[in-house]
């Protein structure tokens, strides 16, 4: 897919690249030199936060942050509706860990945080 805007598939760059897709987009629009697109770690995982069937409660963000302080949470301020994309979470993989195991563990951690924000945990 070609998108002439920042795209969901690049949201990981907010926390996992030297220059995020949003900064790159602004640089391109303003005819400025592009920044480095190098990753800051071997991998970054991103999990979408979709509206769940139940309200996660007013303390969901605090519970999500307490569950895993290394996860970066990006919520969009949208009203909740089942299936609606409300945000995403990113987790940069530890560069010293075994890549395959670290990615699987990071994905599980990011999914657990997304479940809290969705109202499923």
Language model feature labels by segment:
Residues 6, 27, 73, 79, ...:
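Short glycine- and Lys/Arg-enriched binding-loop motifs that mark or flank ligand-binding interfaces
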Residues 40-41, 47-80:
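Glycine-rich active-site loop/lid that clamps phosphate-bearing ligands
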Residues 27-35, 69, 115-119:
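Generic secondary-structure signature for well-ordered alpha-helical cores
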Residues 3-52:
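Active-site "cap" helix and flanking loop/linker of ATP-utilizing ligase/carboxylase catalytic domains
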């Amino acid at each position: 897919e070609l998108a002439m805007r920042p795209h969901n598939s690049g949201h990981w760059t907010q926390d996992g690249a030297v220059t995020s897709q949003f900064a790159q987009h602004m640089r391109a629009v303003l005819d400025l030199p592009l920044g480095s697109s190098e990753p800051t770690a071997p991998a970054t995982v991103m999990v979408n936060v979709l509206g769940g069937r139940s309200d996660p409660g007013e303390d969901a963000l605090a519970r999500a942050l307490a569950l895993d302080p290394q996860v970066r949470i990006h919520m969009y301020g949208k009203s909740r509706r089942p299936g609606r994309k409300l945000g995403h979470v990113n987790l940069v993989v530890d560069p010293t860990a075994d890549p395959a195991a670290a990615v699987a563990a990071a994905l599980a951690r990011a999914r657990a945080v997304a479940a809290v924000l969705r109202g499923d945990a």
